């Protein structure tokens, strides 16, 4: 526990620093680095770490995508990011299919689907952090919610489950998670988003739609826990405890950012509804 706390004391200020400089190239560079490490972790777990025909294109796809939304000129606004994402995903998909066809008998289609899906999940998840920052009104504030939601949910799900947990959630996937913990994490995520709204309203003078914030908190709590369970399922199927050890006490990038990736995609999608997710203006 001490190791986890000490690591968190380093990670949180580092994250704040990344968000503070989100108007610079340091922001997409940070996500590109983490995306590359996450790809390394996933390919190592799948036993394809040295399969260069698959891993190198995956690295290029995941590392390059966060830059697709960065406004490299004053006239650019990240508007081409979605098109770049779709085109890159299509090219990578066709490449994986081609490798599958030419490796008949040694590379099953089911394994190809797993490789493609995992890579797409990582690449789009980290790219969504850039898409939100550069392509959404007040994106810098929305980026805060991407991290607040999953980490509040995870923290309070742990403590609620520890003190009140009686019923297992999905023991086959994650034996320690409980229904009570899941509910507690969800409630505190909603509360956390409401508190965020109060700070924005009374501290910075924004107009806040608290109903929208509450709905967002509910959806984020659910989707972040799904992301966590997906990552846990992959680990259980491969018989590992953590994806890596880059973050002492927390594991690897995929251990720490599994729920952040699903949340970033969700909040980016919500921001596209009706021309903007109007919770703050």
Across the structure, where does each feature detected by a protein language model lie?
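Re-entrant/interfacial helical elements at transmembrane boundaries that shape
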Residues: 162-163, 233-238, 261, 266
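Membrane-interface alpha-helices at helix entry/exit sites of multi-pass transporters
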Residues: 170-183, 243-257
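Interfacial helix-loop-helix junctions of multi-pass membrane proteins
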Residues: 230-246
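Hydrophobic transmembrane alpha-helical segments of multi-pass transport and channel proteins
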Residues: 218-226, 253-261
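Juxtamembrane boundary at the C-terminal end of a transmembrane helix
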Residues: 269-281
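Membrane-embedded alpha-helical bundles of polytopic integral membrane proteins
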Residues: 1-218
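Final/C-terminal transmembrane alpha-helix of multipass membrane proteins
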Residues: 256-272
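Membrane-embedded alpha-helices of multi-pass transport/permease systems
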Residues: 153-156, 160, 226-234
